[in-house]
Structures are given as C-alpha cells and as structure tokens.
A protein has these predicted regions:
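Membrane-interface helix caps and helix-loop-helix hairpins in membrane proteins
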Residues: 52-55, 107-116, 177, 224-225, ...
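Alpha-helical transmembrane segments of multi-pass inner-membrane proteins
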Residues: 2-4, 25-28, 67-70, 95-106, ...
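Loop-to-helix entry and N-terminal half of a specific, functionally important transmembrane alpha helix
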Residues: 36-46, 98, 216, 341, ...
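Long extracytoplasmic/lumenal interhelical loops at the membrane interface
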Residues: 176-178, 284-299, 306-307, 311-354, ...
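Membrane helix-loop boundary segments at the extracytoplasmic
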Residues: 45-55, 349-354, 379-418
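Transmembrane signal-anchor hairpin modules in multi-pass inner-membrane enzymes, especially those
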Residues: 1-103, 109-113, 117, 137-147, ...
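Hydrophobic alpha-helical transmembrane segments
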Residues: 355-367
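Membrane-interface micro-motifs in multi-pass membrane enzymes
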Residues: 56-63, 117-120, 178-190, 230, ...
Length: 434
C-alpha cells in the first residue's frame, strides 16, 4: 500500500511492476522462472536484443534463453501448463506444417538449404512457440508477454535510430539493420503499435502509460525512417481497424491515440518519404516493370507452385528456383548474372516452397489464430490488430517462417487456452503494470 511504512518482500516488489489482476475465480499468479525465460526468448528471437549489444551476443543469450525455456518447461508439473492444455486447431496445424516441411525435403532443389531451414530454424521456432503458449496460465500472462513484445520493438527501434542514420538522395531511408531489413522492421513496428495503444489507454500506472506513449513515438519515427511502402499499407490497415473495430477503448481515446501516431508521422516524414509512398500505385514503378520487381517474381512463384503443386521446390528454395528454374536462369550459361530473388510475399513463399497443401496449412494457421482471439476480452482488438499488421505487411515480405509470426500465434493460442472454458469477466485492466 502506498502509505504503509512496511516494506514488501522483494518478490512482491518485483511482481508489482508487471502484476496482472487474475481472471475472476483464479488464484493470483506471479512471474516465475519459465515466464521470465519466455520473456527473454521474445526479447531475443523477435526483439533481437542480443544483436543490439555485443556482450549479450558474445554469451549467446538467444540460445541460452531458448534452451532454458524448453528445459524449465519440461520440468513443469502444473496442469495448466501441460501439453494437452494447448492442443488445439492452431497448434495441430503448426505441427502439420512442420511435418509437411519435412516431407518436402524429399523433392527440394537444394536439400542442404531445406535441411538447414527446417532443422536449424523452423522446428525450433515451432517448438518454442508451443512452449510460449503453454507457459501462459491466465490472461494476466498474455498481458505480460504482450508488454515484453512491445518493449522489444521499442528498444530495437531506439537503438537502430541512434546507430543508423538517414541521409539525402538515395540514402534517405534505413537499409539493412540488425537481422531485419528496413521492410521487415517496418512490419515489426506495425505489429507492436496496437499493443502500445492498448497499454497507453488501459494501463493504470502512469509510468506504463508514459512508456507506451513514448514507445509509440519511437515506433512511428522508426517506421518513417524505414521508408517501407508495404509497411505503409500495413499501417493503414491497422489504423483503420483501430478506429473502427478497437472497441476495448472508447472511440474518443482511439481517435486521440491514432492522431498522436499520425501527427508524429506527418511531422517527421520527409518529401522523399511521401514521394516514395506515391509510387505504390504507379505503373512505372520497378515492381511493375522489371523482372526483379515483385509482380514478376510473384508471377514466377505461381508458376513454381503449378509446376510443383504437391511438395513445392523445397523449404527455403525459392531463391534456388529463381536461379535454376526461372526463364532467366539459362542466361547464366552465357556468363550473364541472374539475381536469385526472394519471394517478397509470404503466401507465394509458402506455396512455391511447400506446394498447395503447405499454402493451405499456412492460411489455416492464420485464420485459426484470428478465431482463437474471438473471446480474448480487452486484449482481442490489440492482438487482432497486431496479426492484421503482420498479415498485410508480410504480403510484401518473406516472413512465412519468422519468429515474429509464431510469437503472435502463440499469444493467440495462449488466450484461447485460458478463456476456452469460461467467459472472460470484467476485471481491472493492466493491473499487472500497476
């Protein structure tokens, strides 16, 4: 209590920073070692915290966080965290996607590329995504991890903007950053913005609201610096959803919060930025006219799907297909260089690499994640908006296997787990941040 002369135990003081009022009828849950490790995983796998600070990368923080998360989960004895608690349509679909990726190894153009992606990357991502969902004990934990996701995006943005500069001319926007390129980063910021709006309007602790407000400014500035046109489209989609569907926050406050972001965008966007955005619908843009533009790449990607409808060209092999199967590939025998392009579309990426069954599984994972959020209470609009931001942004990017997506999917599954058997009752929002 604020006026008490007694000192709370250290554990209670730590819990007070991110303590969430439990759903009515549940016992109060604290931060525990598993949830702390899950937070560390999100900060490293999505927020790339270890790459921002050399000392953390030197000690292999990402590997440590992931390993500890799995080890502590395996030692779990609580019923709410048992594997059966998160066996649902979405997790089953992710499991089927992993199986289909392994099956697609048999027809991969370059087996080494596929084996590396499947066994050194995606299986780990899918496994820890399952553990993230399983670690969630209540809606409280979802709020905690959503705040960690937001904090990771804000920290990443702040560091990037202090270490990378934008100049003039062709150098007016950010380029390749830590792990993400500028377009990936723009989508990351867009997925975090709805969470910032949620904590800005729902948190009772002033420090948390201040962090959310400053975080939104930082995210918006970083978003502008990215100069991403696909990110701009994703931002517009999220903004429309926030204004018209974000019912957990009163309309007046939604409009004011959105206005804050828009004002920062208008105040910081340069003429180069708006010139770049104006080319989105231009028929003369390289994406429309050049063979390395997105439309031509997507067209060839559909061709790879039709030529390999069942198992695709193999996980991670889209670029290999560009260099060996595309109409331009024959030029290489004459000493003419050919660009081995990325798909620049997550749906084309999955469809070309895993065939139509893989594409169907991917779409089903996305749809089931949205469905999983239908009873998420106050968190539904923010997490739904984050997923919308990812889906729209990833339409122009190669993010089908990304930790960003499967962390959001894990939060959706976690919400479904803790609300599946009971109606979410009104409760003090964000008391975990009080």
């Amino acid at each position: 209590m604020m006026g008490s002369v007694q000192t709370a135990p250290a554990d209670d003081r730590f819990r007070g920073w991110l303590r969430i009022e439990p759903v009515a009828g549940l016992s109060e849950e604290r931060w525990d070692p598993l949830l702390i490790c899950v937070a560390g995983y999100i900060l490293t796998a999505v927020g790339r915290l270890h790459q921002l600070f050399g000392a953390l990368e030197a000690i292999h923080l990402a590997a440590i966080a992931g390993a500890l998360t799995v080890v502590i989960y395996l030692a779990n004895t609580r019923e709410v965290r048992r594997p059966g608690a998160v066996r649902c349509l979405t997790t089953n679909l992710v499991g089927l996607l992993v199986f289909w990726m392994v099956l697609s190894l048999t027809t991969a153009l370059n087996a080494g590329v596929s084996v590396d992606l499947v066994f050194n990357n995606f299986i780990k991502t899918a496994l820890i995504s399952f553990v993230v969902a399983a670690s969630i004990r209540s809606v409280d934990d979802v709020e905690r991890l959503a705040f960690v996701y937001l904090a990771g995006a804000v920290i990443y943005s702040a560091i990037v903007m202090t270490r990378f500069d934008v100049g003039s001319g062709n150098d007016w926007r950010l380029g390749h950053l830590y792990y993400y390129d500028a377009n990936d980063y723009a989508t990351f910021t867009v997925t975090a913005m709805p969470l910032g709006l949620y904590f800005l309007n729902r948190a009772q602790r002033r420090a948390v609201r201040l962090f959310a407000a400053v975080g939104l400014v930082v995210l918006t500035l970083g978003f502008v610096w990215s100069g991403s046109r696909g990110g701009f489209i994703a931002f517009a989609a999220v903004a429309a959803y926030v204004v018209f569907r974000f019912k957990a926050i009163p309309l007046r406050r939604r409009l004011l919060s959105t206005a804050l972001v828009v004002v920062v965008l208008l105040a910081t966007a340069s003429d180069h930025y708006w010139e770049q955005m104006s080319t989105i619908t231009s028929d003369t843009d390289y994406n429309h006219t050049e063979e390395s533009g997105r439309l031509q790449i997507w067209s060839r990607g559909v061709g790879y799907m039709l030529a390999n409808p069942l198992l695709g060209v193999g996980p991670g092999n889209f670029a290999v297909a560009e260099g060996t199967l595309s109409p331009m590939a024959a030029r290489q025998q004459f000493g003419i260089g050919v660009r081995w392009n990325a798909p620049h579309n997550s749906f084309i990426q999955i469809g070309a690499e895993l065939g139509f069954p893989g594409l169907a599984l991917y779409i089903a994972i996305l749809v089931s994640s949205f469905v999983a959020l239908r009873r998420a209470g106050d968190l539904r609009p923010s997490l739904t908006a984050s997923l919308i931001g990812f889906v729209v942004g990833s339409f122009f990017l190669s993010l089908a296997y990304s930790e960003m997506l499967y962390t959001l999917v894990a939060l959706a599954v976690g919400v479904q787990k803790v609300t599946a058997t009971r109606q979410v009752q009104p409760r003090p929002c964000c008391e975990s941040l009080n």
